[in-house]
A protein has these predicted regions:
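Nucleotide-sugar donor-binding/catalytic module of glycosyltransferases
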Residues: 1-115
Length: 115
């Protein structure tokens, strides 16, 4: 009997909420990507119809990191609550971490320590 291949479950889903944060969002995403961890994680970035360069910056990161970053671009403003709960619904992780688009993690071992 042949065994089915099973993909390792995502340990942590990192939810990033953005709205007009072009000056900060790169630092936020970079602080996630610099994590030194053996955890399998995904990044779900939900942009709430930003009118600045935030969507373009996120598209660039999604193109460079398609295996880990899932991008949801809203065409009209839906608000923080809807944006958050939609990303939560889409998440596959056993655990959830939240990072606002204008914030960043200083510790490159944050995920490993926290989870």
């Amino acid at each position: 009997m042949q065994k089915l291949k099973t993909e390792r479950q995502t340990d942590v889903s990192i939810i990033v909420l953005t709205y007009c944060q072009e000056n900060y969002v790169s630092q936020a995403i970079d602080s996630i990507l610099m994590q030194e961890t053996n955890l399998k994680y995904e990044i779900l970035a939900g942009d709430d119809a930003s009118t600045d360069g935030t969507p373009d910056i996120l598209k660039s990161y999604a193109k460079e990191n398609p295996e880990v970053l899932q991008l949801i671009l809203r065409e009209k403003i839906v608000g923080d609550s809807y944006n958050f709960f939609d990303l939560l619904r889409r998440s596959k992780g056993k655990y959830i971490a939240v990072l606002e688009g204008d914030d960043f993690w200083l510790d490159s071992h944050k995920l490993q320590k926290q989870f």
